[in-house]
C-alpha cells in the first residue's frame, strides 16, 4: 500500500479577531522545494506565489472554525475542529497525518502523529501553514477595508501595539474574540 501523507497546520490561533483557519496538504509527487518553509518566515508576496505552486502540486483543503466556535469551545478545540474539517475535505484519504504541535483531532482509521515545530521540519506541514495563512490573510484584508483603524491587513488581527491602541481608542468590534485576554480585559475596564 502506498504511503499517503497529509500535513496539517492552523493559522490565526493567537489572533484577537475572526476565525481560525487550518489546511491539509498531500503532495502529488515528492517535492523538495527549499522555499516551502514555515509561513511566518516568508514575505507576504512570496508566500502568495508559493501558495499557488503548492495548490497546483498537491491535493489540499482549507477549513476554519468560526469566531462563535472559538468563543464556545475555546481556541484549542476550535483549532482542532478546523483541522478535522480540513482533513475530512481532502479528496484522497491519507494513511498518515502529521500535525503541527502537540495536540491532534480524533481521526478514525488513520495514523495521526503530532510534530512539535512541524511547520519547520516537514514540508507537508509547512505547505499547509502557507496556504492556510494566505487564505486567512485574504479575509483579514477584506475585513480591514471596513475597519481601517485596526490595520488588520498589516497585523492579521494579532495584538500588536497599533491594534491594542486602536481597541483602546475605538473599542472592540463584533469580530473581536471576547474571551481572549486583551479583549476581555478591555471589556472589563469598560464595565467598571
Regions found by a protein language model. Give the residues of each.
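RNase H-like, Mg2+-dependent phosphodiesterase core
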Residues: 1-192
